[in-house]
């Protein structure tokens, strides 16, 4: 069954800081509380392939999967997709960054 989710948030911080922090995959466990670890498997230019591992769920299961991201600083977008199975069947996400008077609008589509 295919699904579609969109989320957004305005972060009251400079665009460069938001871009740098949210694209620093190695530090995602400090930025996103659901991740226990992030291991970089391969990096080439703006493309990074990595393994994310979550903290154990309520039943003690630990989910892990491999994803790939391609960041495009000029267009303020990042394309991400799941390479290896994980807790979901599909994942294809576009991260969109937009400077607003209130801060940086981040959208996940």
Swiss-Prot record:
Gene3D superfamilies, alphabetized: 3.30.530.20
Superkingdom of origin: Bacteria
Transmembrane segments: none
SUPFAM superfamilies: Bet v1-like
Pfam families reported for this sequence: Polyketide_cyc (PF03364)
Job description of the protein: Involved in developmentally regulated synthesis of a compound biosynthetically related to polyketide antibiotics which is essential for spore color in Streptomyces halstedii.
Family assignment from sequence similarity: To polyketide cyclases.
Protein name: Putative polyketide cyclase
